[in-house]
Structures are given as structure tokens and as C-alpha cells.
Amino acid sequence: MMSVQLQKQANAAAAAAASRGDGVAIPAASPTQVTDAITQVAESPALQNRAGDSESPYIQAHQDTPVAWQLLDKDAVALAKSQNKLIFMNIGFKACHYCRLTTQESFRNKNVAALLNSSFIPIIVDREERPDIDSIYMNYIQAVNSAGGWPLNVFLTPELEPVFGGTYWPGPGRSTSSAVEDGEEPLDFLGILKKLQKVWTEQEAKCRKEAQDIVLQLREFAAEGTMGVGSTEKALSGAATGTTVNVSTGVPASTLSAETPTKPATSSPLATDLDVDLDQLEEAYANISRTFDRVSGGFNLSPKFPTPPKLSFLLRLAHLPPEVGDIVGGPEEVEKATHMALATLRALRDGGLRDHIGAGFHRYSVTADWSVPHFEKMIADNALLLGVYLDAWLGQAAKEGRTPTLDDEFADVVLELGDYLGNTGSEIGSSSIRQGSLLATSEASDSYQRKSDKHMREGAFYLWTRREFDATVSSTEEGDLTNGKHDGELYARVAAAYWNVKEHGNIPEEQDPNDEFINQNVLRVVKTPAELNTSFGIAVDEVNQILAQAKKKLRARRDIERVRPDVDEKQVVAYNAMAISALARAGAVLRSTGLDKTRGGTWIKSAEQAARDIKAKLFDQETGKLSRHWFRNQKSSTDALAEDYAFLIEALLDLYEATGDESAHLDWAQQLQDKQIGLFYDHVAAPSGQSIDSEAAKTRSGSGGFYSTVEGAPNVILRLKDGMDTSQPSTNAVSASNLFRLALILNNLESSTNGTKTARQYDYDTLARETIKAFEVEMLQYPFLFTGLLISVVSARLGGQATFADVGQGLGVEDASNIIAREFACKPRGGLRALCIKRKDAVSEGVNVGVSGIIGGVEQLKTGEH
């Protein structure tokens, strides 16, 4: 449907963007001859811009553009069908730099808008509001190009089948300083629109046929669970070439084979019939080790993502049962795994991704050494990183058999992230991202540097010239270190050496093709206080004071003079749940150890209030269903997805272990778990008393695991199962873990009571194993892409451990139960374990405080720590 020539031209047009880290999609294959002539279409009734009717800040920001944006609903689809026009779908998010650039260059261009409005039905989608839609078309883009990114621009038939797609295309007249190999001029956004208009007018039948064929293949891969793993690359565009990194996942395309194994025809879903075994953890570790950057930390080259699931997997290897360590290669290999994770966390802590003046981490780096970030801050990323840094901090103390201290490495990052997410009253707590008790989705990459500026710039809030930096740090105030000992200029030089601030800026020229970062500096730590002591002859303690005061001055100037990046005010269930989990775990450590009871209590209260508000605002008591997000004092009309349930259940289990409140947290977690199963689970057999009709069978594969969307969801052409970890843990990895944890907790609570049983609609343990089995064929070939599910393989094979504590007078009292609770809180995550709070009707002689109940897997857990 698209010529090879157009493929090359579209890719060349986006080459400049790709050099900054945004993926570029190759249009669908199947060559046809395309000319430059533009076919005039019959006039249709003028469309009206409906962006203002949206519940998304990203979409609402487009209500003043000349493009007549439609929302993804039955009316827009019906319009495309009645007028027989291609749908142009833009998928983006508010914090994204290239999404804003596309809007500025193309969607505000009158010629682009005129062609979109007359020849297409333009539909705009917020990927954070509808990640299910984004996932479908991102899979298509990745299938034909092995890379993706945002904005995601796709042309669809009126039946929503993809015809052509890409990411960022330069606006009309914007120079790309790039050309294709055979000398063809690169196409800009307007040129691509003209080509698509021409092709649809002259070759509609062929476009439809090939789009239908592609959807059929994608549907087959989705049914097999192989979507996104590699088979689509072969089927739709041939084997992948090069080392393209997918900016939506951080996965290098070159690591994916073009062959995918066939599922055994006789595969059985029985709980004990798992083909995937502990050996896959060794294979995953070996692959991750091969991609580790031993110079700069992280994995692969660039762009580089923090990838919390991968870091968590590496850290967990040291805290899994010894059987796992033996399979991985023994203590030496486990130590290497820990080293890779810690080296990466140090690089993140010191590098350009961290906001050294405020708090939090940016989304990813466009350079291998973490020096130049894309500046958007995502709440989900920071919540997940808090959990990983917490495990890294606790792991050092656990290795030495002691309680953690605030002097241990990474404690400072844990405190910073915890306050950023859960303590707006702190010096660095960000009130801008907290809307009431819930967190907004993100802070944007672009902003105005000064209130009088007319144009936004990428990273404007975070960048410093050497002149401005020196003037700020060298300024003197009463009580300032600069009053007395040394002059302010020396202190500015010390701080500049620490953060690598240079006269002509520290951003490489190749990362600034449009001269936007001339003389600008990204702060990153390149010297230790000890090295500064040697260079400047200033005591280490005084160096630390200088840096602390410099940070305080820079933050004050930034807050007063600069304009904070826009905040996406959506409060998404899944992202808030990630923060609840991390705050509950981190707060429990600070409170139970006494390291900072006030701060720990604040974090836990923040997490509990967020959970209460989700229940009050976004949970329907009658139906038991969640809504996806809260925005401007009302819940969205978009139903929650499987990931919202998964992460919220996990958060409630973490809150239960932090507080011991069974009625508030454990009971609701079980209620949500049953609802998630009812809405999203692909039952291997019909649940008791139910039957699956022939129509329903068309959207189910009967292989276990959770679909991302409910059955019959409108405008969803594929039901996908999310099993592969990306920058976030997969829905099915989190869900399998939740099912095992619930089974462990409830089984042990029931065994401790005098005949009291908790009513259960489902066998959680069996469903967890079925969920693993749903992905085991892919896990056998690509285990490194399924690190989250691999941890549940350990649970399935070796079981888990439940530790009992008695709330007694409350978890704040120092008694035997609180010692147990403290020891539990201070253990980094490893395998399956749970803290069970004794019920009032527990049989005292049957369960003692601190005695662990064990549930077994295929092999019983005998020794080792979970």
C-alpha cells in the first residue's frame, strides 16, 4: 500500500528526531507506485474541533488548533465510514517534547489542518488515558519497523485497521539536514498527508485488503501471546536489522529473533504442568549481562532507560532461595548481578536524568553516558525507581545482617523520592504534582524559562548557563558560608566542578541539531567531595556544606524566576497505585526502624489517603468496577484497564503489610482481584456455573492470563495480553504476583483461625500458574523480556513464606510482633513472602508470632530467604 520510496522518504524526514532518541516507524510494506499528484476529494460537511470535550489535558490542549479533532468514539468512526475517509490518529501525551513539537509545527499549520480536515477524519488519543489503543498501534509500528515512540501517528481504514504509520515527522518547510541514500528528498508532514490522500483515492481496495491481512496476522500473534516478541517482525516486514532501540520499551530490536516457537499442540494448563523452569532465570541473567554497559551502567547503547523491572530482577537474585543462585551460577554470578544493578543506580543518581536541584528523575537519556535527558518527569517512573532504590538501600544492610541506616548508600535518594511523591510539606516535596491526595501523571519536558518568554524550550526549567549558575551560587546572604572564609567565586567554581557546569555548555553538539542548547548545562555529578577537596584544598565537610547551599540557592532562583513545566493533571489509578506501593514499603522501613518515624508515618498516611480517595472517587460500590482516572473534580468515563486493577491490588497488599489493616486493605484487594479476574481473565475453562458462547470464544484464546481490555470494548480491534516488561512491569507479571500473594496470605490466615474461612470465588494459586503458562513458550525463548513473570516462576516452583505478627496494641509498639514487622519491612524484595497479621479469632496454640507458614510449589521451599 505504501511504496518503498515513501518508506525511505518518511524515515529520512524523521532522522533528525531519531538522533535525539525518538523512534521512527517504517510504513507498511507491499509496494505500489505513488505519484506526487493530489486528488481532490468531494467536499464534506465541515468538521468541528471536539478536543475541548475531552477528559484529557493532552487532548484539551489541541482545542485551539485549526485541526478539527474528533474523539475516539462511535460518532467519529461512523463519520469515517459514512464519508469513506482514512482516519488519521494521533496518539501522544502532554509531557512529550516531540508531541508538542508536532502540534506546533504541523497541527497549527493551516495547510496541514486544511488537508487533514478535508481528506481525513482526524482523531486524537491520549496514550495515558487509553494505553490499550496505544499498545495496539504501537505493536503495528514495531512490527513493521522494530522501533516506536511518540507521537504515534497512524492512518487507519474506517474500520480502524492500520494502513501506514510513523512517529515524529517534521512540519512543512522544516529542514531535517537528512536525505535518503538514493537521493530522494525527505517528506515533511504535509507531503506524507498528500501521499496518503493519493493512495487511498486510487488504491482503496488494495489498502483495505492489506490492512485486513495485517490485522489478521496481528490477531493471530495476539492469540498466541507472541505479540511484540519478534514473530511480527518477520511476518510483516522481514527480519529486523541493525540495533534500533525501541523508545517505547527500551528493548533492542536486534536481540529479537525472527523465529517464534510453535506452542505444543498438547500443552496443558494444569498448575503442575509448567515447561518454564528456574533455568530461564539463568538465561535471562546471561542475556542482560551481555547487554550491560560496563562503562556507564545501564543496558544497550542509546537511548537509555532506567528500566526498573530489569534492575529489580537483578537485585532480587541475591534474595531468592539458594537454589536459584546455584542455577544462575553461584554466589559470584549473583554478586555480578547485584553489581550491574548498583552500578546503574549510581549512574542514574549522579547523571543527567536526576533533577539535582529539586527531586525526581527524567524519563530517559539520549546518550549512553546518561548525560542528556529528555526532560519529562513521569510519576510512574519515579514511583518504580523509589521501590528499586529502596531495595538497593536495604540490600546492603541485609547482606551484612544489620538494620539499615541513613548513612548507607542510596538512603538519600530514597528520602528524596519519598518526599517528592508523598510529602508536599517537605523542602523538596512537589505540590505541583499532587492534586489533593492523588498524584498527577507527569511534568512536561518543555517550558518557558522566563515568564516573559513567548516560546517554550525543551528542558528550559532545568538548564543553566555558566554565567547564571555562578551568579546564583556566589551570591552572599547573612549566615552564608561565603561570608568570612572564602569569596563567592571560589564556591561557584567548586559547585561548577561538581556538577560539570562549563562556560560553553556541556551538551554535545551532535545532540543539538537545532542550536537550542548553546551554552546550556545539564547538571550531573562528575566529581566526589574528596576529589574536590584535593582540587580546591577545602575540607570535605565544608565541600558538602557548599554543595548543600548551592543547591538551596539554585532551587530558590529556579522557583522564583522560572516557569514550572506544565503538569498533566490526570490522576491515573495505575500510576498512583505504583506510588502507594513504594511509599507504603519505604514508610514502613523508616517508621519501624525509628530512623525517621515522622517522615515514615507521613508517607504511609499519604499512601493510605490516596487509596481511600481512589475508592471514594473512582470505585463504583454497586458494580465493583474502577474508572481509569480522575480529572478536574470528576471521574473519567473511561473504564479502568487490567493494569489499574493489578497495580492497585499490589498497592493494597503493600499497605496491608505496612499497617495491618485487613478490612481497609486486604479485603478490598481481594474484592478487586475477583473483579479483575471476572473482567479480564482468559479462562482456560469456563468458571463454575458459567459457559463461554461461540461469539465470546472469538475474543478469547482459552490459554490463561489477563487481557488488557474487557471483552467487547468499543473501538478495540485486538485484545492483547501484556506479559513483556518494558519501562514498567507487565500487567500479567504484577497480576501473577498478586495472585500468589493473596493465596499465601489468605491460606495462612485461614489456617490460623478456628474454622473461619474467607469466601473465595476463584483459586488464586491455580490462576497464577495458568498466567505464567500463558506466556511460557515466549519465556522459553526470550526470558530476558519477562523478568517480572520469572520471579513468579520461582514462586510456582519453590513456594513462599508467610510470617505472622500480632497487631496487639498497634504496630507502633515495640514488642515481639513489631520486631517481626520491622525485620519483614527491612528485607528487600526477593521471592514470594507475606506478612500476615493475626486475626482476633486466631487459635493461639496453632500460630505463634514469628512462626512462618509455608505454601509449596512444585518443589517445596526448604531453606533460604524469601
Where are these regions (language model features)?
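C-terminal capping/lid segments that line or modulate ligand- or cofactor-binding pockets
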Residues: 455, 463, 637-662, 714, ...
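Alpha-helical positions within canonical tetratricopeptide repeat
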Residues: 336, 340, 406-409, 413, ...
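Replace the tail clause
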Residues: 1-578, 582, 630, 688-698, ...
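Phosphate-binding active sites in nucleotide-utilizing proteins
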Residues: 568-617
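Short coil/turn linking the two alpha-helices of tandem helical-hairpin repeats
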Residues: 318-325, 393, 397-400, 587-594, ...
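Extended, leucine-rich alpha-helical cores of fungal transcription factors
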Residues: 569-576, 580, 585, 600, ...
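Acidic, turn-prone loop/beta-hairpin segments
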Residues: 680-731
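Long hydrophobic segments that form regular secondary structure
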Residues: 575-584, 734-752, 759-764
